[in-house]
Amino acid sequence: MKHIVKNIHFVGIGGAGMSGIAEVLLNLGYKVSGSDVGSNAATRRLASLGARVAHGHDAENVTGANAVVVSTAVTNDNPEVLAARARRIPVVPRAVMLAELMRLKQGVAIAGTHGKTTTTSLVASVLAEGGLDPTFVIGGRLNSAGANARLGTGDFIVAEADESDASFLNLFPVMEVITNIDADHMDTYGHDFARLKQAFVEFTQRLPFYGIAVLCVDDPNVREILPFVSKPVVRYGFAEDAQIRAVNARAVDGQMHFTVLRQLNGHAEPPLDIVLNLPGIHNVQNALAAIAIATELEVPDASIVKALREFHGVGRRFQRYGEVATPDGSGTFTLVDDYGHHPVEMAATLAAARGAFPDRRLVLAFQPHRFTRTRDCFEDFVKVLGTVDALLLAEVYAAGESPIVAADGRALTRALRVANKVEPVFVEQIEDMPQAILNAVRPGDVVVTMGAGSIGAVPGQLVSHQQGGQQ
């Protein structure tokens, strides 16, 4: 006899990965509760859907729960975790709960160091346009849906697969995407890159014999693991041996135009002329993954083309806030926000900004995320930050880590001055960033706010400041 689970509690329910699973469970008819240190858009949405959300962690919050879901950000000494264990309430890792959802449907899991959220969103959008009505769980807000999760009536669930804590090895999907493999979250893998690559090989081994691994062969590390993948593979990218291949890619007014050549199972599919409503070569690659999945699932070509042309993007992934007035009223600047926090992601986003807004001054307001990442990627950060025209650099967002000597915002500032590529302005308190941006901008500038921490609130503050000034 199965233990009947009706009430599920989430510790850290406002997190991107947690809130999506919570919403799907609510839609499945479960009673959902949760707690978080503060309120955000995700907690407010869940509360409006019927979840009981507590602010702050307390042992009493787990009362009545049949299961308690935790992410790796939740420590073992959390009072709710301690209370659950004391009361013998099962404590379930987030990835295990996601795996349970995947058991209900056919899973499409999107993995890779960079591009997971955008690729997952593109796959979900294309499948939805093709009439497959997928369930999806995304690490960002899909603008067209107004949410980061939805319960569909179709056979498929599309979700991100997180390698940061190796939790993607809990999943058993029928289709997988690997966008790229890069050195990040190396603490999980003992700072051994070979172990990280082996984890991705093991991820492909989770597929059934009839499953498909969709791999970006433009990435050298993905290409390196190809000989060790024993399941059927679909290669995508710009490379000549890609089965789903982009050619003639070019930037046009903030969009990407390209042609897709498809060769699957020894059969040439008709080429597709694509207009992707996103900037950047990296997003062409993300779209190719979605095209590969859709082609395998026999989504009509017209639906693929329409979904990509009308794609409305994902929150904090090159999210355009439009034009904001300069403080003196002499003109406006274009405001864009992005979640990028690894040098490779940042370089791709900044290249996309240059392509979308050629011949304009590029101003970057960046908040590094985690002291360990700043330490491990220090020289790469200096290199990519030196490519902009003006730089506002915040202190590192700790994300629970202790400071590391010579791996903070001041150290980056000093190194950038020595490199003499750009003169950084160090903004120690993130609360001062909106004013620092207003002090630095000129009419016609493109301002990109970037980072995975609290800098995500800055664009909204700039827009609110302007609206307040106009009233």
From Swiss-Prot:
Keywords: ATP-binding, Cell cycle, Cell division, Cell shape, Cell wall biogenesis/degradation, Cytoplasm, Ligase, Nucleotide-binding, Peptidoglycan synthesis
Cellular location(s): Cytoplasm
GO terms (BP aspect): cell division; cell wall organization; peptidoglycan biosynthetic process; regulation of cell shape
EC nos: 6.3.2.8
Chemical reaction(s) catalysed: UDP-N-acetyl-alpha-D-muramate + L-alanine + ATP = UDP-N-acetyl-alpha-D-muramoyl-L-alanine + ADP + phosphate + H(+)
Annotated InterPro entries: Mur-like_cat_sf, Mur_ligase_C, Mur_ligase_C_dom_sf, Mur_ligase_cen, Mur_ligase_N, MurCDEF_pg_biosynth, UDP-N-AcMur_Ala_ligase_MurC
Record GO terms (molecular function): ATP binding; UDP-N-acetylmuramate-L-alanine ligase activity
Residue sites binding ATP per the record: 112-118
Pathway terms, separated by semicolons: Cell wall biogenesis; peptidoglycan biosynthesis
GO cellular component terms given for this protein: cytoplasm
Keyword Ligase recorded: yes
NCBIfam families linked to this entry: murC
Similarity annotation: Belongs to the MurCDEF family.
Protein name: UDP-N-acetylmuramate--L-alanine ligase
